[in-house]
Amino acid sequence: MSKSNTPSSPALSRRKFLRAAGGITFAVSASAILPKWIMDGAEPALNTEDKGPAISAWVHIRPDGRITIYNPAAEMGQGSMTALPTIFAEELDADWSKVQIEFSPIEPKIYGPGAWGGRMMTVGSRAVSGYYESLRQAGAQARYVLMDNVAKKWNVPLAELSTEPSMVIHRASKRKISYGEVASFATMPEKLPQIPKEQLKDPKNFRLIGNPDIERWDMPAKVNGSAKYAIDVRIPGMVYGVISRSPVNGSKPSLLNAEEIRKITGVIDVVTLNHGIGVVADTLEKALKVKAQLKIQWSTDAKAASHSSEQAYAEYSTLVMDENRKGRSLEAKGDLNNALKDAQKVYSATYKNDYLYHAQMEPLNAVVALAPDGSSAEVWCGSQAPDSAKAAAAKVLGLDESKVTLYPHFLGGGFGRRSNTDYVEEAAALAKAVRKPVKLLWTREDDLQYGQYRPICLQYLEAGVDQAGNINAWKYIISGTGDNLLASGAEMPFYTLPDLQIELRAVDHGMRTKHWRAVGHGPNKYAIEAFIDEIAYDQKKDPYQYRRHLMRNHPRALKVLDTVAEMAGWGKKLSAGRAMGIAFAERSGSPGAGVCEISLDRATGKIKVHHIWAAVDGGVIVQPDNAKAQTEGSLLMGLSSIFYESITIKNGAAQQSNFHDYPILRMEDVPETLEVKFVASNEPPSGLGEAGLPFIGPAVANAFLAMTGRALRHMPFTPEKVLAVLGAK
């Protein structure tokens, strides 16, 4: 497959595109799968070096046979930029060696999936699942257009034609013609047919989907250094912007030495924003140096100023036990109160999860250039929600969205943080103020201390068991800041529990919170799965078999659990000083289960994970190697979060500032073996980017419980916390 050096493409006006393409073009809506004429103002990023009509908004086939497929998803290392075109190319029956991939234009009405209401968002591990059916349909429609044109040219029935990779075949006359040749004369039908699902490819005939030889399109450029991230952007006349932001969210700035700062050589301007003071200078070094010289007085009336982590946990503990306090019901069925009264034994426990920072590798950045007359603008950024970023920039600049062109770039990590648009808005505000192209950069300290964290939360669980020791009553109350961010993962669709109540009691501390990889599934599945093991341990039941009973009505989940137990050799005799733990979780439609083997240094409190086994049902696997890498990555990020990561808030301000006091997992901590297996499935693809993270934390906690008889109920499991648990009476 041919590869371009950069993921972005020049935007063209509709008029220029039509003239260059030499034919008509239309858009295939990903959400409705209907042809739509591209309206004036839309700017398809299509290459114009060869004439020939665009078969659809998703693909451009040139007379020489080259095929450009347009990818609407952000590429941040998760592989969507290869996976989505693979799906389209499968139904198109394209020769993959002739395929090249470019980012699609930022046109959500055309490229927005149904999964997010038509928005171009790459979040929640739903790029592949969100586009799968629509891209198969669009690819099949493009194939139909090619075959229909050949049928008319050769005057043969369409039903007599078939395809091979990038070729239309008429077996009766032994004729064949390449897609490139067809593109040179093809015309578009007035209306595209809806291809019946049964006429799409049978999965057993897939050549590209599931093919382990299909390599990631972006990898060569990332290895040789030619891949372009937004942080690499340089444009003529560009200046640099940095911002001194409030250490406490909601505090307002007053700059006390503005005139002094403006007199410094190289300073273009200082700009007052609602949440900070921006410095624009001719070099980044100058901007950073001057930023350190700002004398800012911050207002003291911010809501977050009264918030501290430890006080919050005390507040949550009181809140979850208050019988008069009612929160938002997430799920309720049966008669919980009577079930608890009738229970043979009732268990209860409380779990805690600290704030977490996204820690994406590439610092936040964006470039915004306003036209000299202020009538239009260009934006360069890496974003998980480029349509939102485009709209946000337009709003700050006072422009209609059609007057803003956004060039998407690779992202050096996202994890949910880059689905927000604050860094693009800041760059736009500085560019508007100085009327020059501005490159805004966040330092690591900026990002960590003014971050949008995974919310702090506390979970209270109460469960009753019957005479056989099986759970039949379940009460779960979550309290913390972040509201909906805490709700995901609280429900248990694969466990059969007749009487249950799940409730969210949210508190607003005025903090900035955001989706973090796996969102609420991380803290919620930790609490749920650890609590289940505590009950099984007290009942002297095998935790694997205990879960099998809970899953008795869900064969898909059982298959995953049984698979991982077999992989790990569950029940085998372990070496002295070793223990195993097991846990189950579903994220983004993918049931997954993990087993880990640990050891414990009782003198230092350090837990060492030696082996991890993971089984996941991700439906049809589009890219096997990348799917495995994604699952491994989520497992390792999960390990990092459960052993090291914690943001502590005191009087509204983060007490950590960089990786010296916010450590993350290092190579020396990676397990000796990490085995991932995908359960064979004919289900449509489901999410894999976060599948491993929710179950690895409780698997470790459960192994610790099996080894020591003690429960770990506060993430992260630092040596200090482990020693405290071991020493507790």
Please give the residue ranges for each predicted region.
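Cofactor-binding beta-sheet edge motifs in enzyme active sites
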Residues: S2-K729
